[in-house]
Amino acid sequence: MEGAVIPYAVGVDIACRMKLSILDLPPATLDDKFNLYKEALEGGTRFGIGSVHETPKDHPVMDQDWNVTRITREKKDVAWSQLGTSGSGNHFAEFGVLSLPELDSELGLEAGQYTALLSHSGSRGTGAAVCSSYSAMARSRLPRKYENLAYLAWLSLDSQEGQEYWSAMNLMGDYAAANHDVIHKLVSKLLGAKIIAGVENHHNFAWKEIHGGRELIVHRKGATPAGAGQLGVIPGSMASPAFVVRGKGNAESLNSASHGAGRRMSRKQAKEKYTWKAVQQDLEKKGVKVLFAGADEVPGAYKDIEEVMREQADLVAVVARFDPRIVKMCSDGSQAED
């Protein structure tokens, strides 16, 4: 799109993000010290739509200008209380084994297997409030002849509202990154581990990019940047691998790739088809211990990530594979934030 942004095409969970941290602990400790890993996940983040930390966490993002819009100003205290929390829906924090087949100089890692922490979450309640407010503004300004495109209503970046949304969206990007930073630092501290390398990337965002000689606003909802040489993480499900990838810069896809496996069925269908207890028992047989989760997030609700990766081999190259071993998600029935 040229010169305009579509708030709803960015999405409710603005700047939802993946972050992978490689730790200095051997993979064998995932079994040998399971209780320590469990306590680190349970103490290091909170799940649920209204989840907060008992004591607000410190991060430089809270010193940024939150007065860029009325919504961000009014929601700053809520955002601070939710800093370092994970929310609901398909958001997770998990430990697993990262398999790197060959030396990667950018990661600074030799070939081998590593213990790693992977998280998926975004800008929490404040991001949702920004989306709701500016999507409503965009719809109210939509010419009548386009009324059938209500959820694709746009804001011109030459307008005050468009500039406000753009500033708020970028603040939410910084806030989402800070969320993951707080989670990973706290979890690794509770674990007594050192972070030796990492990869992160976000989706549900809009970027100003040059394509075909024109500046465009590229919206990636459910997609992630995959520019030439750009590192990222593409997850599967709680029982299937995630992949560290390096973008190939495919112009036809606007330098983009899928941000995950994607669902094969709705949450309602998953709850009707699967019982959580049976799924949990099956996962344990496969070596995956799930601390908390809901039936709507079972592996069967998702597409085959291996097939998805084969289908986008022209978009990204696989660098490493992450296999989940200890998983935590929301299990309190909260409305999905993703």
Feature annotation, model-predicted:
Residues G3-P7, A15-M18, D32-V52, P60-D338:
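Domain-length cofactor-binding catalytic modules of enzymes
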Residues V10:
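A domain-level signal for the structural core that forms small-molecule/cofactor-binding pockets
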